[in-house]
Amino acid sequence: MGRILIAHLFLPSSVGFSFDTVPHDEVGSKFMQKEESKDWIADTPLDESAIVSEEESDDDSLLSDLPEEIDSTNAQSNIATPSPGTVAAAISGIQPPPKTPSSDSPSLENSLSNLNDLFKSRGRHMAFSKNDGTNLSLPPSRHQSPPPSSVLASQRHHRRHDSELEEFARRASRSLSFSMNGTPQRRMTFDAEAWKNVIFKIKPSSFGNASFYNAISAATRSKQFDDHLFVGTCGIPTDSLPDSLKERISHDYITEHSSLVVYPTDTDFVGHYNHYCKNILWPTFHYQIPDNPKSKAYEDHSWANYVKVNKAFADTIVDNYEQDDMIWINDYHLLLVPEMVRERLPRAKIGFFLHIPFPSSEVFRCLATRQEILKGMLGANILGFQIPEFAYHFLQTCSRLVNIDIRKNGVVSFENRQIDVIALPISIDPGFIDRCLASPPVEHWAKVLQDRFRGKHIILSHDKLDPIRGLRSKLISFERFLQKYPEYRENTILLQVAPESLQDSEHLPHISDIVTRINSAYSNIASRHVPVILLRQKLGYAQFLALMMISDALIDNSLREGISLTSHQFIYVQRKRHRPLILSEFVGSASILNDNAIIVNPWDYSKTAEAFRTALTMSEEECQKRNKAMCNLILRHDAASWAVTFQSLIKESWKEQIDMQRIPAFTAQLIKEPYQNAQKRLILLYFEGTISTWGSQYHNVMTSLQRTINLLNMLTSDPKNTVYVFSALSCQELEQLFQRVPKLGIVAENGCFVRSPPKGDATMPVSKKEIAELWKNKVLGTDLTWMKTVSEIFEYYAERTTGAYVENKDATVILHLREAEDDEAAMWAAKECCESVNNFNVPCSATIQNDMVVCRSNKVSKRLAAEDIYSANGGDYDFIFAASNDPDDDTVFSWMKNFKQSKKEVVPFTFSVCVSEHGNSTNADAESSGVFGFLQALEKVYSA
């Protein structure tokens, strides 16, 4: 059994360095307690809820120092004992007193602490977390800012801030002298010798998607998940590191932490992450189209960096790939990796999961690199999204922008491959949360917070300071709530946890103004009541769980978001108190929880204000009913089952793809012997593009048609054979075409009308009256009023596509595109027609067949017609053969395969052929690249 290579931009653990010149043992003793000094380079699993925002958790950690996995038998030893700090002080409204410097707290360490704080707001180039008291630092970054300073003039005001960083850096490192300025003109200098024997430490990282990593950890503990390696960056600048040190780091990662380190250049990483991901992809995927000059500069200059980082990941994956390995690529940072790996490993198992929303096609098409991104994603065998809406948007976008075939079951046909598109929402790990809730730190904080907020209604919220999170609309709605309902002004608090993010500098002033306005109007000095508490730091998980326990409601007012695991955790934590959840309708979780949550439109301030009151006045019976229903919904699949399920789906999708690729070329030898030995045969052949090359219905290639008629006469002359031809043409057209094949069965308009073969001597003439009596109307009594509506839709697109025309038959409507002057316009019209009809509330479906768009009733299909033919003729066939070039006939091939599981005494021999250059069928037994080759092989079968 192979491994799983799990690619994510950040590894679950990061690296910090010590520049002290003391021996290893002394450093170990200094860094850790004595009993831990022997193995201080140790990794611990990230907890599932360390980062509340599962979709962009690298900026949204709840933990400044991540707790280790809790052992249910000894929870206390694994969670740090709480101590008073900035969080408690902020909640109480009193700032903690400054610490007095001592010999145990040298100025260097204080400087590093300040440096850490400054670095945290600058993305990837951060000092290592210093929460355990270790003296750790980072190598200097050598990145150059991709957009030139002349374009991004707004960055000039940061230069004084940069000089402060430089001063801190000089004080913090004895061996380094470097500049943190992002401009190309200022380069860093350092002493390379200082890095040769530097001691480093690997421990859990504050970057990355903690909910994802916890799901993998939970699945691993369940013993249902395969061995795996993480592939990602280590979260630090690496250009300054000598190769020998990188080798040491990589060795420890692979041997101790099951991780493969990717080393992009600092310039590429900053351009990729800080610029393209954060300023282009993240806003666009959340419906905030970047249109300012700064964003345009990022897009123009950082796309190349984005490509290079994706290529670095692909190179690492390919270089370490072994036979039978599976590759699982995650999130919008690595959208190009699937295609890059597919080009070099055509038969690899590749899955891709997008943890953030996928926008509608009208938004996605605004990206200049839309084609490259879509094709990059389509390199996978399976694409996973959080909810069906996101999967639908992706399918719709592919249909409109890449011109590929989309099937109703969420399968994309692209470059002779079938890609499955599925929705699989991530979930929480209830076992881990239970162990945390039972731990002393959570109990302690719950008691502290209950005492602090006794007699108050607490409405909790946790968001980054990002415009997408809807903080502004939330605060305005809360202000209106207080204005309209004065009885809540003295006893209700909106407690907003807002950890820092890359967008702080731009968004914070707007939020601060609103908070100040509300608190100025409704605070009470005498009672020390403040209606809005804005916490600008990351909370420990114990603290946040305690906050959720004592809160009277939680609101997620995001303008766009995937699955809100914060909301799911709140629901689970509130199983005893049953307090309600206020949820934006634009959050993916809303489609899962439905009306059990209080669903709001974040743009409607008045309705959101009413939602606050509804949450605070809801009866206990109603709260309990809603909470129970929501718990049942979120616990259908936990975090472990999510990871295990997606792993299984990657394998299944890959197997289907391999089975399709293994389809042999159709030759007479494949069915010659079974054909000769059979006593009763059923032969089903599609007309257009299978037994006849097909132009328009008036321009058939006559030589091919004559050859087809000759072959059909040979087959129908054998009394052991029952032969049917399927077609999209009408009854009259098919009778005219095949009047020289009197013993032929015909299925017209793709299953709407069926004519059985006449009985008796094949040489006897058959009258028109007798032929007419043989036709069976399969749509008799079926509602066909939709035809007028569909015809109008088809006419709309035909008028805009030169050479296209619409044909209304007895039970189908066809848009003919074969003679369209512009092939690209014709393909666009076909896709749009199918989408317009299939998304319209009419009892019919439209499919693309041989340069036609055919719309028929949902009550009929070629598979149903095939089943009726089989039953009507006794059903005791010992040989069933079918051939088609229509992807829609894959259902017929699937029906034939079911005979192999039949419990009948005599199981018929079945064989299906896909006649197509692109191998459109996954259920066919063989394929033929064209009509002439297929006819030649079938002629050999008969004449053998």
UniProtKB/Swiss-Prot annotation:
GO terms for molecular function: alpha,alpha-trehalose-phosphate synthase (UDP-forming) activity. Pfam families: Glyco_transf_20, Trehalose_PPase. The keyword Glycosyltransferase applies. It comes from the Eukaryota. GO terms for biological process: trehalose biosynthetic process. The keyword Disulfide bond does not apply. The modification Phosphoserine is found at residues 141, 145, 149-150, 163, 177. The modification Phosphothreonine is found at residue 189. Residues 73-113, 129-166 are annotated as: Disordered. One of its GO terms (cellular component) is cytosol. Residues 173-652 are annotated as: Glycosyltransferase. Coiled coil: none annotated. It is an enzyme of class 2 (transferase). Signal peptide: none annotated. Residues 101-113 have a biased composition (Low complexity). It catalyses: D-glucose 6-phosphate + UDP-alpha-D-glucose = alpha,alpha-trehalose 6-phosphate + UDP + H(+). Residues 73-84 have a biased composition (Polar residues). Its EC number is 2.4.1.15. InterPro entries: Glyco_trans_20, HAD-like_sf, HAD_sf, Trehalose_PPase. Keywords: Glycosyltransferase, Phosphoprotein, Transferase. In the N-terminal section; belongs to the glycosyltransferase 20 family. This is Putative alpha,alpha-trehalose-phosphate synthase [UDP-forming] 106 kDa subunit. It comes from Schizosaccharomyces pombe (strain 972 / ATCC 24843) (Fission yeast).
